[in-house]
Amino acid sequence: MNELTRADWLKWASVTVGVAGAAVPLSFLLWRTPPGVATPPASILPVLIPIAVVIPALSFGLGVAFILFGRNLIRADRPSVLSRASFVSIGWLLTNSWPHSNFHRVSEGWANLVVVDYFFHTTVIIGSCIVAVFFLTVIRERRGAAQINRSARDLASASTT
């Protein structure tokens, strides 16, 4: 399953947009703005709302689609621990910006802000490291397989001459 069909793209897009569409209003229901928290000036809201609410919701929706549809690929083989960890990491990297930005919006005081940032930033760094190791491992395995194929071709051509 290396290529996505039109139906696959439609499934992914539907889940992404559907979840994002639900996440935007849920942002304000689940994370109610506490009274007295500083609010941004009205002049920057047209820029702030897409960055702080819509884009994280779309990323969250894509993360949900990735988890829903990507898990079948993980189940297909006996995945390594690194493959599973990468799957979880990618899911987290895609979904975490929605709660992260909402916790920022409602955090009261520097202590709460520090806790939010330590938790989210640390887990993003860990997840990114896992994905980087996975990527390098896959590239090395492919390079090794390519070398084996070249060696086999060289042996085959040498034996025919």
What does each of the following model-derived ranges do?
Residues 3, 65-80, 131-150:
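Cytoplasmic membrane-interface segments at the C-terminal ends of transmembrane helices
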Residues 59-95:
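Loop-to-transmembrane helix junctions at the membrane interface
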Residues 8-19, 43-50, 84-86, 112-116:
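Alpha-helical membrane-anchoring segments
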Residues 33-51, 93-120:
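Interfacial non-cytosolic loop connecting adjacent transmembrane helices
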Residues 107-149:
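Alpha-helical membrane-associated segments of multi-pass integral membrane proteins
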Residues 1-23, 137-141, 155-156, 160:
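Cytosolic juxtamembrane helix and N-cap/initiation of the first transmembrane helix
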Residues 18-63, 67:
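Hydrophobic transmembrane helix segments
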Residues 19-29, 88-100:
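Aromatic-anchored segments of alpha-helical transmembrane domains
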